[in-house]
UniProtKB/Swiss-Prot annotation:
Protein name per the record: Transcription antitermination protein NusB
GO CC, alphabetical: cytosol
Keywords from the UniProt entry: RNA-binding, Transcription, Transcription antitermination, Transcription regulation
GO BP, one annotated term: transcription antitermination
InterPro entries per the UniProt record, alphabetical: NusB-like_sf, NusB_fam, NusB_RsmB_TIM44
Electron transport among keywords: no
Protein's UniProt keywords contain Transport: no
PANTHER family reported in the protein's UniProt record: ANTITERMINATION NUSB DOMAIN-CONTAINING PROTEIN (PTHR11078:SF3), N UTILIZATION SUBSTANCE PROTEIN B-RELATED (PTHR11078)
Organism in which the protein naturally occurs: Streptococcus pneumoniae (strain 70585)
Amino acid sequence: MTSPLLESRRQLRKCAFQALMSLEFGTNVETACRFAYTHDREDTDVQLPAFLIDLVSGVQAKKEELDKQITQHLKVGWTIERLTLVERNLLRLGVFEITSFDTPQLVAVNEAIELAKDFSDQKSARFINGLLSQFVTEEQ
């Protein structure tokens, strides 16, 4: 059985990913986080979890740096723009969590893979796994 904290963080990562996708189409961090967090709740007047806001605002603040780090791990001839928005945002979220949080690296990688399975396909999940695993290996 999954612990409540892990389940909660997993759900917040999902909300963070949804907020990041929303930000691709023009909104602000708080609005994107609020919608992602409350869209399926009856009570929408809630305080947003700090973990959610920290993830989304952190990825947004370091977007260019994260993209450079991701690009360094792409195959020759590939650019960040060639990736789908889903893959880009999952990789940004994964790299940000690996480099900026105390989350164990393997947990951050696994969570990104699970999100890829939910929002994309197995091919994308394998790609996310490969790139983030390479990133973790080279960072050690």
